């Protein structure tokens, strides 16, 4: 360290406190990174990696960015999961002896972003804090850009569902704990010292934040794990934000039992937030329903989808509001137009509180407040009864509008310092400074013209840079005409730069005026923000009301476009849907192309539907549309059906598709069984179970046995008796209806004509005893030889009396053993699930069977 420069020592002292972050070190007009940080920045930001001498014989890697381009580069690093410590100059050059003082003013992490261009407009940016025990967990979350702060304590089995619902950008954990994230989630994991999660430390942090003596008023006094998570979260935010976190005024405490529960598999299988194919908004339920016009409405819709209601009165309030907008098309259209002019008032309110809002954003806020007044005139003066509940917070804020109108210019720049933010006439002293700076600039322009005429040098020009200040530049060709009073300041390749006493005098005048102007404008702007901060709660209340109106009117718009109907709720444990449709599949097919289907499920007489039929015929679509209709109804939306009479559903479970969990070392079948076990252990009589192909991951007889046992268990357990849709390729299960009274058989109608099969996609009563797997294989494009041979093998398998000691030889001389002595191959063929094989897998299987037959000399 002896040969290290003072600047490097200062940097190292700061860097040692932020070893896991990239330090952006302010040096004049640049943020510089050093050493390994510089290598990372150069690679990830695609900027030049250079070096700087920072001691005798010591060259340090260096990469920098202009200070005004910070947000752009910051977003690229944050999106890749990095943390960035912003180290600013906190004193001015010359104010203190030696180096300019520097300190980290903020640690930016994926879960603590507040810059608008770094955030998804219609999605919260949650920071999640977890404290885990063997069977329980405390969970706390916050979005400092919207002031949301909440916590809960729940069973460890429900944790993954909450993580999937919140989709946090960052998760904090004690250093001695670990977490396996859902496969679709890309969250940064940050570890904290376990000290911050200790019960007494965390409780004290919450009490200090809310300035209270106990937490009873917040409803979490008896949630010790939730308190640990919430207290640690506040400590982390305080460390990263270097502020008091005043925007987190309320703590929302909830339990998972307050809402319909859906695990992460259900959210994924039903494609609630993202499509399974492209992992995008398009093709998801959110993509269908999101006709919202505001950022606040988009975020609220996500919350609705993640937390369907269980209280019928709350559902009916939403449905009544949707009724109004459904019936009043002019009001709906007018509101949509107005909402389209509303900025993100929720995040703006918090940026005012944090004093980070830009002058130009205040004009956007002013325009939004004017639109709020117009919406209030339309709905608030005489509130329609069906909207009254959601209009409570909608109130014009004329005083706030007046402050902005009187203080901020009509078209301010994004930054302060040029005297163009504060309106003329607001502060006399500032007006004088602006005039002085303006006069000086005019003088310089006039001086340039005058000196050109006086010297006869037409190419003479005045310029400015931060190193030399103002200067007169003269090309080499005209140096012979330079007056003697010009003082040489800098030599360039093709020109010389000069100053004069007169120019230096005005330089001091201008720079002093600019410095004083920046100080004064910054101070006045802060005063304005302090005044506007007094309307924080009222602004948030307006944002909340507008978000609700936005979502509910969007539900009505979707209902009108797609011919949805209002669902009806009743106390009986049954659901009865007439001509139900799958909202996403219907959109993909186009209007009128989807085949609608009925469904009736009841705990009294039709608790379980066994659904049989070929793949590709629509079994999964039918199962999913039922669950989606139930979910849509309980968020207060109309539903895709002709009629829908429903009961409240406490949980939706889905067991669909095959997947491995490689991180846990679990096979496809083990994953299937674990998920099925979870469903059977936690479902209630008010749950809806969607089970597709239980038992497919093992041998035929094992799978059939498990599938049958699952159906019998759901039917016979008094504490379960959940409404169940059970799709299967095991045709033997249709026999269950003969001795289980609440089991009914349904199948997918198929039309056959001269060997051609047409799937009608219509659900009809009764079971089927025939598979159409080979037909599906034909549709998939398997070679004609394979299809022909498959039909031959199927015929032999279905007619054992006609078997010969050896099967006849086909054109390719492929022989399949069918005698008693070759029972192993025979059993393997019987267990083939042809309808589940891809074309390539089917062909590979045929070659495998051929090889085994040849090895046996058959």
Curated annotation (Swiss-Prot):
SUPFAM superfamilies: DNA repair protein MutS, domain I, DNA repair protein MutS, domain II, DNA repair protein MutS, domain III, P-loop containing nucleoside triphosphate hydrolases. Gene3D superfamilies: 1.10.1420.10, DNA repair protein MutS, domain I, MutS, connector domain, P-loop containing nucleotide triphosphate hydrolases. GO terms for cellular component: cytosol. ATP binds at residues 613-620. The gene is mutS. One of its GO terms (biological process) is mismatch repair. InterPro entries: DNA_mismatch_repair_MutS (IPR005748), DNA_mismatch_repair_MutS-lik_N (IPR007695), DNA_mismatch_repair_MutS/MSH (IPR017261), DNA_mismatch_repair_MutS_C (IPR000432), DNA_mismatch_repair_MutS_clamp (IPR007861), DNA_mismatch_repair_MutS_core (IPR007696), DNA_mismatch_repair_MutS_N (IPR016151), DNA_mismatch_repair_MutS_sf (IPR036187). It holds the Pfam family MutS_II. Keywords: ATP-binding, DNA damage, DNA repair, DNA-binding, Nucleotide-binding. This protein is involved in the repair of mismatches in DNA. It is possible that it carries out the mismatch recognition step. This protein has a weak ATPase activity. This is DNA mismatch repair protein MutS. One of its GO terms (molecular function) is damaged DNA binding. CDD domains: ABC_MutS1. Belongs to the DNA mismatch repair MutS family.
